[in-house]
Amino acid sequence: ANAVGIAVGNAPYSPASVADYAIMMMLMVLRHIKPMLLRYAGQDYTAGYLGRELPNLTVGIVGLGRIGETVARHLQGFGCRILGWNRTPRADLSDLVEAVELDELLSRSDIVSLHLTACPETEHFIDVAAIEKMKDGAVLINTARGPLVNNSALIDALESGKLSGAGLDVFDGDRL
């Protein structure tokens, strides 16, 4: 494939482990787990961190390869709406996700979960323009590759309240 200019990628680890990790990050951000744990460490047990529940939300999965598909399959048990976008449409997943165009996914999703490879076409895939299309208060999850997200745009969106949270397993080369 490389000889004829076709890029080939493979993630040698279990799609299920990454999918579970992505969903765990969604739940942690939605339920404010880190601030809650910090309060508990200081022996502050007052209420105030109820958060949001997945059954009331729409999750948009960007990239429906093995990992993105597995995220969608695992999310089915949570009762949320699942939207999906893939560079190459996946008609075989029509029973699992509602296939939509990227702009629609960004505008309708309460959570956007990235599952793309890193290549020149996906560098800073989530930038100022993409974030502007996202729902106010949305959450961004990136367990794929750091360069998919423009760090400066993400920080600005979090500080302004445009995004309510982010779960990041990977970062672009710059420190956050």
Predicted segment positions?
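An N-terminal-biased, well-structured beta-alpha scaffold segment characteristic
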Residues: A1-V8, S14, S107, D127-A129
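Rossmann-like adenosine-cofactor binding region
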Residues: R87-L176
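Structural/interface elements that position substrates and couple domains in central-metabolism enzymes
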Residues: S17, R81-L83, A91
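Glycine-rich Rossmann-fold phosphate-binding loop(s) that bind the pyrophosphate
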Residues: L64-G65
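Conserved beta-strand positions in the Rossmann-like core of class I SAM-dependent methyltransferases
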Residues: G9, L83, P147
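Phosphate-binding beta-alpha-beta segment of Rossmann-like dinucleotide-binding domains, i.e.
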Residues: N10-T58, T70-G77
